């Protein structure tokens, strides 16, 4: 087993414990508590996969964190500022669009829309989002454009359900791509989106989705709309 995998799990367990102590003092807000619950489920799953006891891992994680803090200066403890990256122009972000055969799905706190009437087109996904630690922090808006510039799909956060992770965005992108490719469209991810939010792509920015997976995703959209 990779040592980095183990130590990462140990640190995550300890940091979750610190956040839990914070929540026990009734200091956490609703999004904080929601993330705490989701992360608890994730840690249990990772612990089962790795065959590691969470309590033991938490103690080991505490030692790692304490060792790091002893070596850190106050300057190093400052939180890096997030960066706002733009694929789309203001006009592309604000433009109204309509769908001939509308399909919509809510995945967590993200809303996925696409026009199932679009066939045999070359499509590119572009997005505006913030980045921290070289990873997507917050998605502002993602849209799918044809070569002619028409908008044929979109992923946007739901105002009523704030908070999403880069994995949430990846999953939503998979669903959008699967739905569009069901109609024999060719979907490509922009370079900036590929770099920070979609790292499992090939050189053309096309995600490695086998045909059976694409069909499964498209059927999922059909059944849930």
Curated annotation (Swiss-Prot):
Residues 1-73 are annotated as: RNA-binding and homodimerization. GO terms for molecular function: protein serine/threonine kinase inhibitor activity; RNA binding. A motif (Nuclear localization signal) lies at residues 34-38. Residues 201-225 are annotated as: Disordered. A motif (Nuclear export signal) lies at residues 132-141. Residues 175-210 are annotated as: CPSF4-binding. GO terms for cellular component: host cell cytoplasm; host cell nucleus. It is found in: Host nucleus; Host cytoplasm. The dsRNA-binding region is required for suppression of RNA silencing. Belongs to the influenza A viruses NS1 family. This is Non-structural protein 1. It comes from Influenza A virus (strain A/Duck/Hong Kong/2986.1/2000 H5N1 genotype C). The gene is NS.
């Amino acid at each position: 087993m990779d040592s980095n995998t183990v130590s990462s799990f140990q640190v995550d367990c300890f940091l979750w414990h610190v956040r839990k102590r914070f929540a026990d003092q009734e200091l956490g807000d609703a999004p904080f508590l929601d993330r705490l619950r989701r992360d608890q489920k994730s840690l249990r799953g990772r612990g089962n996969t790795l065959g590691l006891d969470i309590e033991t891992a938490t103690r080991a994680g505490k030692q790692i964190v304490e060792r790091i803090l002893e070596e850190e200066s106050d300057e190093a403890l400052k939180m890096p500022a997030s960066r706002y990256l733009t694929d789309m122009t203001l006009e592309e972000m604000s433009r109204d669009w309509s769908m001939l055969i509308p399909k919509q799905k809510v995945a967590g706190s993200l809303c996925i829309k696409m026009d199932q009437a679009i066939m045999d087109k070359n499509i590119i996904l572009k997005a505006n989002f913030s980045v921290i630690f070289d990873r997507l922090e917050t998605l502002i808006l993602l849209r799918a454009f044809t070569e002619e510039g028409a908008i044929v799909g979109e992923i946007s956060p739901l105002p009523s359900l704030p908070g999403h992770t880069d994995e949430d965005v990846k999953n939503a992108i998979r669903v959008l791509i699967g739905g569009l490719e069901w109609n024999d469209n060719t979907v490509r991810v922009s370079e900036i989106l590929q770099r920070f939010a979609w790292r499992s792509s090939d050189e053309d920015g096309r995600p490695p989705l086998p045909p059976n997976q694409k069909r499964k995703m498209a059927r999922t959209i059909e059944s849930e709309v």
